[in-house]
Curated annotation (Swiss-Prot):
This is Hydrolase ORFZ. The active site is at S243. Its EC number is 3.7.1.-. Pathway: Secondary metabolite biosynthesis. It comes from Pyricularia oryzae (strain 70-15 / ATCC MYA-4617 / FGSC 8958). Disulfide bonds: none annotated.
């Protein structure tokens, strides 16, 4: 596979942006131009390069609006939104739980630009709020199929959730970009620790995502009752997610109202993920009490000073966990696990995938452990999708292979929701 950068981190994140081109989130030459302006491992040049492309895309969007070119305007707004997201992606602030104040401004700008694009979509889109604990309201977007793409009967629903760092607007390039044309309603949302909920409301991430998912499903059921003209089928609700979002999807799938689950390249345990980046001897000494938290913090901060990727990872994790100490961040990670029989609670059909070239997760540990612990399933009710090359989906979260991920996802849902399509 060709690489844009020698460093895996910037290379993967570039593939992540370029991969959205199939659904309008990028243009190849714009990406190549940005790459040429970025120094590997330098977050400042990264942010500047994508900000330039964002502004250029927005100029094109306004020109297209003035000339009445709906498609060009929509696509340019999509690119402007996605490049704006990318421009703020590498911001680390002053360290864990000390975010850059620009992060909130960028997230809100991404949202505003994306809504301009959504107003030009060929299918209905609703921007809604989900009531949640403590008076919070989770932002969500409901993408509905156009009338000519409706399936017989009521509309099946896919809830597509984010993970550690994706914004709701980026989630569009996964399932919402394909689902409505296949007759599905797709709902995306941001929960505690994600997107605007983190940057604007300082709502921290929580491991018991079934509580979050339950509120989302409650909202959908009430929406279906109060707006029967939407024709939503709450007896056919699926839940999906990628990476940490795949973990969240499996937690959500314990709710009996979830009738199918798609977990793409999930993690089994956040702690296990972290331990792949740290010496086992060092961690064992800490857990045995031979090293204090302060010593761990000092060593990890030295590592952060030498590696931008580690600095970014711990800064992001510390912010969504609400912790400044590396030792406390790692302790928080222990709470995010599917161990202890969690997967025994899942009764619905599950599609779970792995990524052999993952930047973060070792598939044989995470994916296969999840698959093997889905003990309440017959072979037909749990499907395993392992990939060998990037074109087949071997990059984490199926980056660069979004069309393939959608094809696999909706084929699986069709099978378990009783949807039959005529051969072409």
């Amino acid at each position: 596979m060709h690489h844009f950068f020698k460093g895996q981190f910037f290379d993967f994140e570039t593939c992540r942006i370029l991969g959205t081109a199939v659904y309008g989130g990028a243009d190849v030459a714009e990406v190549l131009e940005a790459v040429g302006q970025i120094r590997d491992g330098d977050p400042v040049s990264w942010g500047r390069a994508w900000a330039i492309q964002a502004e250029r895309a927005l100029v094109l969007a306004e020109e297209a609006c003035k000339s009445g070119d709906r498609t060009a305007a929509r696509d340019a707004y999509l690119r402007g939104s996605n490049y704006t997201r990318a421009s703020g992606y590498m911001l680390t602030g002053e360290g864990p739980n000390r975010p850059d104040p620009r992060s909130r401004e960028i997230v809100e700008r991404v949202q505003a630009i994306f809504r301009k694009a959504a107003a030009l979509f060929d299918h209905p889109v609703q921007f809604l709020k989900i009531p949640f604990e403590g008076g919070l309201k989770l932002p969500c977007t409901l993408y509905l199929p156009p009338p000519d793409r409706r399936l017989p009967g009521k509309i099946p629903i896919l809830i597509s959730g984010g993970g550690a760092d994706a914004l709701q607007e980026e989630l569009y390039y996964m399932h919402p970009s394909a689902g409505p044309d296949l007759g599905y309603a797709v709902l995306t949302f941001e929960g505690p620790g994600q997107g605007v909920m983190l940057r604007k409301h300082d709502a921290k991430m929580r491991p018991d995502w079934e509580a979050v998912a339950g509120a989302v499903i409650d909202f959908l059921e009430e929406l279906a009752r109060s707006q029967p003209d939407l024709d939503l089928d709450t007896s056919r609700i699926a839940f999906s997610g990628c990476s940490l979002g795949g973990y969240f999807a499996l937690r959500a799938a314990a709710d009996p109202r979830v009738k199918a689950c798609v977990s793409l390249d999930p993690l089994y345990s956040f702690w296990d993920f972290a331990m792949e980046h740290v010496s086992p001897t060092f961690i064992n000494a800490w857990e045995a009490g031979w090293l204090k938290d302060g010593a761990v913090d000092a060593v990890v901060r030295m590592m952060m000073a030498m590696s931008f990727q580690m600095r970014w990872e711990l800064s992001i994790a510390g912010t969504f966990f609400g912790q400044t100490s590396p030792a406390r961040i790692m302790k928080e990670m222990k709470k995010f696990s599917l161990a202890g029989g969690q997967l025994r609670r899942v009764q619905c059909p599950v599609l779970v995938s792995g990524a052999s070239h993952s930047l973060y997760l070792e598939g044989n540990h995470h994916t296969m452990r999840i698959y093997n612990e889905l003990v309440n399933h017959t072979k037909g009710d749990k499907q395993l999708w392992l990939t060998a090359t990037p074109g087949q989906g071997s990059l984490q979260a199926k980056m660069g292979a979004l069309r393939l991920a959608n094809q696999k996802t909706f084929k699986f849902l069709d099978e378990h929701f009783g949807i039959e399509r005529p051969q072409l």
